[in-house]
Amino acid sequence: MAISPGPLFLIFVLGLVVIPPTLAQDDSRYTKFLTQHHDAKPKGRDDRYCERMMKRRSLTSPCKDVNTFIHGNKSNIKAICGANGSPYRENLRMSKSPFQVTTCKHTGGSPRPPCQYRASAGFRHVVIACENGLPVHFDESFFSL
């Protein structure tokens, strides 16, 4: 008994409809991660840098309490999800090597713009969440012991 190509074609078409939105969702979460946490070549890493970057990246409506920018190339950050990372706690990855980072902390006051931030710069290991080999959430950073 031969199966007609109709049902197989229907399964194939349904697969095309279901898979791309999932991949697009992963890509949009990765893009959001990069917008919020990646700055390859920072110009200054002081309080003004934080105020400028937080505003430029639309993280000031309302003023975000804390945000960390990772300085380095995207492929090295992405590699934390693979060879440059180790499992850490539940579903997280910790970088094997430290990254140059700038953490911006809201100095208080109104949660409405203009937002004022204090910068803290250093080399730290970063902890991120990954989905399908892409970073999608920044969890924390800390100095190596």
Curated annotation (Swiss-Prot):
One GO-annotated biological process of the protein: signaling
The record's annotation in CDD domains points to: RNase_A_canonical (cd06265)
| Residues of the active site | 37 (proton acceptor), 137 (proton donor)
Which subcellular locations apply to this protein? Secreted; Nucleus; Nucleus, Nucleolus; Cytoplasm, Stress granule
**What InterPro entries does the database record attribute to this sequence?**
RNaseA (IPR001427), RNaseA-like_dom_sf (IPR036816), RNaseA_AS (IPR023411), RNaseA_domain (IPR023412)
Disulphide bridges: 50-104, 63-115, 81-130
Activity-regulation annotation: Has weak tRNA ribonuclease activity by itself due to partial autoinhibition by its C-terminus (residues 139-145), which folds into a short alpha-helix that partially occludes the substrate-binding site. In absence of stress, the ribonuclease activity is inhibited by RNH1 in the cytoplasm. In response to stress, dissociates from RNH1 in the cytoplasm and associates with cytoplasmic ribosomes with vacant A-sites: ribosomes directly activate the tRNA ribonuclease activity of ANG by refolding the C-terminal alpha-helix.
Q: Which residues form the signal peptide?
A: 1-24
Listed EC numbers: 3.1.27.-
An example GO CC term for this entry is: nucleolus
Q: What does this protein do?
A: Secreted ribonuclease that can either promote or restrict cell proliferation of target cells, depending on the context. Endocytosed in target cells via its receptor PLXNB2 and translocates to the cytoplasm or nucleus. Under stress conditions, localizes to the cytoplasm and promotes the assembly of stress granules (SGs): specifically cleaves a subset of tRNAs within anticodon loops to produce tRNA-derived stress-induced fragments (tiRNAs), resulting in translation repression and inhibition of cell proliferation. tiRNas also prevent formation of apoptosome, thereby promoting cell survival.
Assembly and binders: Homodimer. Interacts with RNH1; inhibiting ANG ribonuclease activity. Interacts with PCNA.
What is the name of the protein in this document?
Angiogenin
- Species whose genome carries this gene: Mus musculus (Mouse)
Gene that produces this protein: Ang
